[in-house]
Every structure is written in C-alpha cells, then in structure tokens.
Amino acid sequence: MFFHAMGVTGESSEPVAKYLQDRYFCILSTSTVYCKGQKYVSKADEVRQVEAYLKSQGVEHLELVVASSIGADLAMAFLTSTKLPIGYVFFDGGQFAQIGKGTRRVMAPFLYLAIKSLYWSKGGTLKKILWCDDDSIKPYFIAAGENLTYTNLRRQLSDSLEDKPFPSLPEELQKQIYFEFGSIEDHFKYRQAVMEAYPCGHYPVFEGYNHMQYQIRDPRGFAEMLTSIAEHNGMPKLPFIRK
C-alpha cells in the first residue's frame, strides 16, 4: 500500500507499482485533499477511509507499506491505529517535521499557491518547488493542483506535521521499518530525531541523492529494492547506500 507525497495524486506511485503488480496487489490511495468534491475532515478520518476500503476489499494482511514525504505522517497515523498485520514499512524521505501550529497556518497559503501554480502552468513551475522538473512526474502534480482547494489544504496542515512527540511503536514493528533519506535532501535534518524515537529501525542513507530521487528517476530499481525488503527483510547491495 502506498501513501503519496504532497502535491501529487496516488497515481504518482504507478511507475513503481507497475513493476510490483505481477507479484502484489498494489493499493494507491489518494488523500481527499486532492480529490474533486471531497472534504478533508481530519487525519483520523483519512485513516478511517483507508481502513474501510481495505475491509471492503477483504484485505487481511499488508505485506508492505510505502510512504513518501508527507505521506509518512498519514502512514504513521495508520500504523498506530490499524489492527491489520503488516510485514514491512518503507519511508522514502519521510517528512517527520514537528512544526508549530502558527507556522503551519502561515505555510498554508504559500503551499496552496505553489501547488495550484503547477496546474495553472501545466507543470512549468515545478523546478521552483522541487529539485527536478521531470516530465514523467508533472501529470501527477497537475492533477492534484486542479482539484486542490485552499480549505482542504488548510485543514490538512491543521493536524499534520504537528509539534508533538512521535507516536510510540512496538520494538518488533520498528525492526520491520526502513527510514530512508537522501544525503542531500532537506528532509535529512529530521533523521536524527527519528532515530532517537525509533532506535530499532533501519536507517539507510542514499549518498548524493535528493528527495525521493531514486523513486522518481529509477522506479524499476526502487520496486526491486522494495521486493528485497518484503521478501528478505534487507536492502539490496546498492552502490549509493552510505557505508
């Protein structure tokens, strides 16, 4: 199951999922923030909707949960509330920021304009807010920007990335979680705090890589890495993993 990044739809995980779909049933959910005509109520409600969908599909076990960027915040809420057995978890550049309420309120209009501009410019402004502007990812930003409303984004930020201690996780679950960061991405600054909160987790660093770079630039390689984790509880020998 995939939890997507900010400013994109769930379809943004399709390039990776297509290399997994012959082996796994892949679920690519989209937050109500980016769904036309839907209202974001709360993080708890997002989790409720995910749980309801999984139940309706008869899902009794999740082999792997993959969460990218701010998707890590929602995935963590899911992990701490679900009763479903979970095999492994992979956080790609998880945005484990702890931001004060006032700052998040100030951020909302700027983020709204940034995401909407991607729709208005047909992806032309992507390089201004992300390290790359690959044509392969622009459609997901454009689709999200088209459906985004300021109210939904403001509501999401009201209960996401909160300035609170990280939720506790059982040691056994921590041992099944991979918290990956690129060494040159801005989110790398959260790594130490996450390591202190979850000392039993795995913390691979992709040397010289930016935010979600491996996933974006090499979805097949990224999918093969996820398969290695799910089937062998270990990272493959990638040349860019920090020794």
What kind of region is each of these model predictions?
Residues K101-G102, L118-E171:
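Conserved alpha/beta-hydrolase catalytic His-Asp/Glu region
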Residues S158-E196, Y214-Q215:
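Conserved serine/cysteine hydrolase catalytic core
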Residues Y198-M212:
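Catalytic histidine neighborhood in serine/cysteine hydrolases
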Residues T80-S117:
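Flexible "cap/lid" loop of the alpha/beta hydrolase fold
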Residues Y209-F222:
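Catalytic histidine-centered segment of alpha/beta-hydrolase-like enzymes
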Residues V66-A75:
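Gly/Ala-rich beta-loop-alpha elbow adjacent to hydrolase catalytic centers
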Residues L28-L64:
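Active-site loop/oxyanion-hole signature of alpha/beta-hydrolase fold enzymes
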Residues M1-K36:
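Conserved HGGG/HGGXW glycine-rich cap/lid loop of the alpha/beta-hydrolase fold
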